[in-house]
């Protein structure tokens, strides 16, 4: 089970976008994630009339290393750590280590 998953609310803790809060869009690999509206880079796109692609400069989100983000705790309004424990039915669930509230309801 992963500590950070797709759709989690995260905050950037290092880099040029430090302090920005957003959600995880997808995982690039096991160590890199793409976060919505964070780490945006301008790319120059060549026009391709066969695919109906207009050329120009496009802003895209580039992946961040997973060590540069932390899960965001909305109750404490700050970054938090993730722990694992088993609930009553025996399923493994994630929880915030600072206050013990469950992430996966």
From Swiss-Prot:
Give GO cellular component annotations, separated by semicolons.
ribonucleoprotein complex; ribosome
The identity of this protein, by name, is Large ribosomal subunit protein uL24
Q: How does it assemble?
A: Part of the 50S ribosomal subunit.
The UniProt keyword set, sorted, is: Ribonucleoprotein, Ribosomal protein, RNA-binding, rRNA-binding
Annotated GO molecular function terms are:
rRNA binding; structural constituent of ribosome
Q: Which gene encodes it?
A: rplX
The UniProt family comment states: Belongs to the universal ribosomal protein uL24 family.
Q: Look up the domain of life of the source.
A: Bacteria
Q: Which Pfam families match?
A: ribosomal_L24
Disulfide bonds, which pairs?
A: none
**Biological role stated in the UniProt entry:** One of two assembly initiator proteins, it binds directly to the 5'-end of the 23S rRNA, where it nucleates assembly of the 50S subunit. One of the proteins that surrounds the polypeptide exit tunnel on the outside of the subunit.
Q: Which GO terms describe its biological process?
A: translation
